[in-house]
C-alpha cells in the first residue's frame, strides 16, 4: 500500500487518539474539580437547554440552585436510596445482583426493559454523558463511575446527584423542586414529600409531583415503606451520608 493511501488512515487514527486523550483529560479534570466545587451545569441541563433553543423557547434557562448536604433534609437522601439504590453505601458503583436480575427480566419481557443503574451511574450519566444507548456510552459510563467512586466520597456522590437530578420540566436539583412543589427549602422537606419527589425520578417528564397519578402515589407509598425498613434517618448518619 502506498504512503499516499496510508496518510488518511494515519491521520484518522491520530485524530481519534487525540480526541480520546482530550476527553479523558476533560472528564478526569471534571471528576477532580467537582469533588470540591459545586456543579454549575450538567450534560442533561445542556441537552434540555439546546432543545429549548432549537424549539424557539429562548426564555428557558436550565440551572440548579446548589445546596450542601447539610441544607438538604436527610429524608430526601434516604428517599432516593430507598427508591433507586438501597445498596448505595456498600457497592463500588455497580450492583451486580440488580444487573443480573435486570438481564433475566429483560430476556423474558423484551417490551418492558428494566434498568439496574446505581445512584453513582445515574450521577455520571446526568453529569457527563449524552442521552442514548450504545456500547461506547456504556463503556464510558463504567469508567467514569469507577472514577467518581474512587475520588469522591459517598456523601459527595449523593450531594451531586440530588443537586443535578431532574424532578420535572426545567426543574433541576432538590432545592428547586422543593420550592416549586412545596414552597419550602430542601432542608424542610418531610418524609412524605421526599418520597413523592423520589417517586417521579424514573421519568420526571412523564410523572408529575404536582399532579401525581395513581402509579406515582403507589410508588410513593412503596418508597415510604422502604425508608422505614432501612431504618429511617439513622440510616443516613450510620453510613456517614449526612
Swiss-Prot record:
Localization, UniProt: Cell inner membrane
Uppermost EC category: transferase
An individual GO BP term: cell wall organization
Protein name: Biosynthetic peptidoglycan transglycosylase
Pfam families assigned: Transgly
Catalytic activity: [GlcNAc-(1->4)-Mur2Ac(oyl-L-Ala-gamma-D-Glu-L-Lys-D-Ala-D-Ala)](n)-di-trans,octa-cis-undecaprenyl diphosphate + beta-D-GlcNAc-(1->4)-Mur2Ac(oyl-L-Ala-gamma-D-Glu-L-Lys-D-Ala-D-Ala)-di-trans,octa-cis-undecaprenyl diphosphate = [GlcNAc-(1->4)-Mur2Ac(oyl-L-Ala-gamma-D-Glu-L-Lys-D-Ala-D-Ala)](n+1)-di-trans,octa-cis-undecaprenyl diphosphate + di-trans,octa-cis-undecaprenyl diphosphate + H(+)
Membrane disposition: Single-pass membrane protein
Documented EC number(s): 2.4.99.28
Keywords: Cell inner membrane, Cell membrane, Cell shape, Cell wall biogenesis/degradation, Glycosyltransferase, Membrane, Peptidoglycan synthesis, Transferase, Transmembrane, Transmembrane helix
Family per similarity comment: Belongs to the glycosyltransferase 51 family.
InterPro entries: Glyco_trans_51, Lysozyme-like_dom_sf, PBP_transglycosylase, Pep_trsgly
Species assigned in the record: Salmonella arizonae (strain ATCC BAA-731 / CDC346-86 / RSK2980)
PANTHER family the UniProt entry points to: BIOSYNTHETIC PEPTIDOGLYCAN TRANSGLYCOSYLASE, MONOFUNCTIONAL BIOSYNTHETIC PEPTIDOGLYCAN TRANSGLYCOSYLASE
Known role: Peptidoglycan polymerase that catalyzes glycan chain elongation from lipid-linked precursors.
Segments crossing the lipid bilayer: 21-41
GO annotations of cellular component type: peptidoglycan-based cell wall; plasma membrane
Top-level taxonomy: Bacteria, Pseudomonadati, Pseudomonadota, Gammaproteobacteria, Enterobacterales
Gene: mtgA
GO molecular function, one term: pentosyltransferase activity
Amino acid at each position: 500500500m502506498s504512503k499516499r493511501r496510508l496518510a488518511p488512515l494515519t491521520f484518522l487514527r491520530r485524530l481519534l487518539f487525540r480526541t480520546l486523550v482530550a476527553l479523558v483529560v476533560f472528564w478526569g479534570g471534571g471528576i477532580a474539580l467537582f469533588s470540591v466545587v459545586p456543579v454549575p451545569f450538567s450534560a442533561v441541563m445542556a441537552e434540555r437547554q439546546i432543545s429549548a433553543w432549537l424549539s424557539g423557547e429562548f426564555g428557558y434557562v436550565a440551572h440548579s440552585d446548589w445546596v450542601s448536604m447539610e441544607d438538604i433534609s436527610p429524608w430526601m437522601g434516604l428517599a432516593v436510596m430507598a427508591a433507586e439504590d438501597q445498596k448505595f453505601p456498600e457497592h463500588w458503583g455497580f450492583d451486580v445482583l440488580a444487573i443480573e436480575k435486570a438481564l433475566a427480566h429483560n430476556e423474558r419481557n423484551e417490551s418492558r426493559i428494566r434498568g439496574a443503574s446505581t445512584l453513582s451511574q445515574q450521577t455520571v450519566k446526568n453529569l457527563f454523558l449524552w442521552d442514548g444507548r450504545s456500547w461506547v456510552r456504556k463503556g464510558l459510563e463504567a469508567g467514569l463511575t469507577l472514577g467518581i467512586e474512587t475520588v469522591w466520597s459517598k456523601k459527595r456522590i449523593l450531594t451531586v446527584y440530588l443537586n443535578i437530578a431532574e424532578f420535572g420540566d426545567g426543574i433541576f436539583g432538590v432545592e428547586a423542586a422543593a420550592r416549586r412543589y412545596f414552597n419550602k427549602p430542601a432542608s424542610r422537606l418531610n418524609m412524605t414529600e421526599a418520597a413523592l419527589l423520589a417517586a417521579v425520578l424514573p421519568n420526571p417528564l412523564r410523572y408529575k409531583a404536582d399532579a401525581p397519578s395513581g402509579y406515582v402515589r403507589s410508588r410513593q407509598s412503596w418508597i415510604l415503606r422502604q425508608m422505614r425498613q432501612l431504618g429511617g434517618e439513622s440510616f443516613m448518619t450510620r453510613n456517614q451520608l449526612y
